[in-house]
Amino acid sequence: MRERFHQGLDELRARLLAMGGMAEQAVERATTAYRNRDLKLCHAVLASENAINAIEREIDELALDLLAMQQPMAVDLRFITAVMKINADLERVGDQAVNIAERVMSLVKLPPADLPIDIPRMAATVSGMVRRALESFLEAKAELAEAVLKMDDVVDRMNDEAYVNLVNAMHSNPDITQQALDALLIARNLERVADHATNIAEDVIFWVRGADVRHHQAAPE
């Protein structure tokens, strides 16, 4: 029974990493679609939503089966709990990617505008957070997860700066209002992806160290 339980834990880890790869790819495709005004990539992101939702359900079912199989030791219980929470955050990352793709589809219908926002730079930072959060899970390294927490403030500042700049641009040139609003929503979605990456990092620290570092409390050694 114990061997089957550990096989289940390995399967749970593998499925979550697969889902993480899908969610990360969806964000990268959506932001590349913005950069290239690529409708084909937008549709690919929309098409990926069902697959991400399906694997989310599979992970939840497997996690519940493992909890019912036997009473896990503390570290295994923390692992399963963390996986279920990370699973929910990854599904929401996929949702944000869909939101970005939909905004890009709106933007492509409009004339290009010179907007005071660097979406590719913000996207690169956010994608890096998601990637590092997943690496911290794969390697069970709280130090990697802590680096993600520090990056969240950087993205928040980018989002705040984008808001101010885009609102000013709309006042100066009302003709670009819709383009600016779409870009503003994309920035907000990216900021939410960063929040989910932060949640994932916090869950990894909880699993590895048994420490609750939500609200950016310092994690004990």
Specify the residue positions occupied by each region the protein language model found:
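Cytosolic, long alpha-helical scaffolding segments
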Residues: 1-221
